[in-house]
Curated annotation (Swiss-Prot):
<dbReference type="GO" id="GO:0006952">
    <property type="term" value="P:defense response"/>
</dbReference>
<keyword id="KW-0967">Endosome</keyword>
<feature type="region of interest" description="Disordered">
    <location>
        <begin position="134"/>
        <end position="173"/>
    </location>
</feature>
<dbReference type="GO" id="GO:0010008">
    <property type="term" value="C:endosome membrane"/>
</dbReference>
<feature type="compositionally biased region" description="Polar residues">
    <location>
        <begin position="426"/>
        <end position="439"/>
    </location>
</feature>
<keyword id="KW-1133">Transmembrane helix</keyword>
<dbReference type="InterPro" id="IPR009769">
    <property type="entry name" value="EDR2_C"/>
</dbReference>
<keyword id="KW-0256">Endoplasmic reticulum</keyword>
<feature type="compositionally biased region" description="Acidic residues">
    <location>
        <begin position="442"/>
        <end position="461"/>
    </location>
</feature>
<dbReference type="Pfam" id="PF07059">
    <property type="entry name" value="EDR2_C"/>
</dbReference>
<dbReference type="Pfam" id="PF00169">
    <property type="entry name" value="PH"/>
</dbReference>
<feature type="region of interest" description="Disordered">
    <location>
        <begin position="414"/>
        <end position="478"/>
    </location>
</feature>
<feature type="transmembrane region" description="Helical">
    <location>
        <begin position="665"/>
        <end position="685"/>
    </location>
</feature>
<feature type="domain" description="PH">
    <location>
        <begin position="3"/>
        <end position="110"/>
    </location>
</feature>
<dbReference type="InterPro" id="IPR011993">
    <property type="entry name" value="PH-like_dom_sf"/>
</dbReference>
<keyword id="KW-0611">Plant defense</keyword>
<feature type="domain" description="START">
    <location>
        <begin position="180"/>
        <end position="392"/>
    </location>
</feature>
Amino acid sequence: MSKVVYEGWMVRYGRRKIGRSYIHMRYFVLEPRLLAYYKKKPQDNQLPIKTMVIDGNCRVEDRGLKTHHGHMVYVLSIYNKKEKHHRITMAAFNIQEALMWKEKIECVIDQHQDSLVPSGQQYVSFEYKPGMDAGRTASSSDHESPFSALEDENDSQRDLLRRTTIGNGPPESILDWTKEFDAELSNQSSSNQAFSRKHWRLLQCQNGLRIFEELLEVDYLPRSCSRAMKAVGVVEATCEEIFELVMSMDGTRYEWDCSFHNGRLVEEVDGHTAILYHRLLLDWFPMVVWPRDLCYVRYWRRNDDGSYVVLFRSREHENCGPQPGFVRAHLESGGFNIAPLKPRNGRPRTQVQHLIQIDLKGWGSGYLPAFQQHCLLQMLNSVSGLREWFSQTDDRGQPIRIPVMVNMASSSLALGKGGKHHHKSSLSIDQTNGASRNSVLMDEDSDDDDEFQIPDSEPEPETSKQDQETDAKKTEEPALNIDLSCFSGNLRHDDNENARNCWRISDGNNFKVRGKSFCDDKRKIPAGKHLMDLVAVDWFKDTKRMDHVVRRKGCAAQVAAEKGLFSTVVNVQVPGSTHYSMVFYFVTKELVPGSLFQRFVDGDDEFRNSRLKLIPLVPKGSWIVRQSVGSTPCLLGKAVDCNYIRGPTYLEIDVDIGSSTVANGVLGLVIGVITSLVVEMAFLVQANTPEELPERLIGAVRVSHVELSSAIVPNLDSD
């Protein structure tokens, strides 16, 4: 008898071989080792239509919102990393049901993580040899590690997900301004809060909202473009209810958004991204000032803490040209951050933040400050409109229907939910799988299972200064005294604070890492001195991805090898029409036998993926871009594909940003404004046990105002 973890009616979603999509109601059953679905609620030993064995290699991919036959559904795709072609795609008409299934399946996957036993023989890194293909030929890094269960609580909350893909990341032009808001809400650190106060000032309080204005001056925007402004308010409703209203452009929007005239869907890019046309109703001397309209890309995501982020930015589209009688405004960035708060008196509460940075264009926008101010406040007042709409609306107990952009569905398929029961089955998993393959031909001919295609922390405890100094002393080691003058890269080294198109070594104390007592009190300390010295940085470009850059003749790693030094080379690969690679060369005299870093260097890929961590910072640049990058530590091997090449005197880590749509989207928007940014990155090996603590940085780098044109094409001939 198999124990049923979860079951119920869900939507089977897919596309037939002739290209037409379909949705059907199917009964899904989740067991501890199996996910299956049936045409009807199963009886006795009834064979399922299709099954999938659930183990630690399975993933739940969030495909976002899709419209089919007048219904908007929230799509999930479950697959095994070892057999990506074999997957089950399911959907729900309401967000809560889809998220419940997602949570249940992920819990089952987590229970199987312990079955993935690390084996140095199973995943063996190789040493590169001349003549081998320059492509991705090193050992596989597509395997998870059981050590990931020991990640920071605050890290796992906002990480690029190790197990779940949240769909395509923000499009290249979209700026995610919400990361700092996440830090504020989580009270991640006092420095983050001070950083936020430094860049915002409270402008006024209006209609129960706090209106803030950004203090940061930017020189790359026209005079007519306003500073970013945000409205912050509390709405007594769930995040899902508010998200439904924010995403809709039907008649309901007139009841809470006083700046909305009308809108339509221009193009559905994927489940998380759409191009919209939006006419504004600004009502400011309409006889003199022409009305404004917008064509923008909208991207949304749901975070692990239950919050929703909706981002906007203007975009040109061939099917949405300028309209007669309207001035096309330019939305530099904007959107909503919808985050849950603790309930009060049994009622749900949500903090809604609405940010807008817009250039209204036209003759008056640059010379009539009152016009700009009036329009911005009118648009920001939509937060108070949301609050009042929910306070005056009854009968909100029914499940939230996901809004349809065009031709909102007035009727829906009945979502029958069977009562809880334990499905009896005497068949083994292998027998069930084999039988279900045969049953598909005779029982699911109208429901083709071919894969459909779509375009591609917690608060930290207070620490005393004395404790921090004590931990820092324990991690300090004598300087390596390496002569850096013999190393060079094509990106210039410059320690001047205002230098451009260059790099310098970051102060380790800018980053916080796990202290000696982290397992007991979750305390983090300034990182202090690096384990290795950063000696050179290369900035490359090519028409294809650049793998194994250490083979380039005369590179810093080869120079280090000639001097008897060991190198760790991090090759950050940025995909695109032109591929870029930023290569960091870290050097040390020797590996300490038995140390965590030595185990990382000589371990297998599974162990490396479970431990390699990145801490990003963006100290200078557009405030909105800073939020899209954030400052939360990320286990790189869980977020993107990392290819490890172990040589006699080096370890090269090729970090393929293009392997993650989330990371690719974030990095894509950074590339667009890279010349205005100063970015800091720290690399380290995560410590999980008291014996491994405290953590030490491998190294850290600060890259300032990099010019894309300064990248060179490397000569990577193997000989």
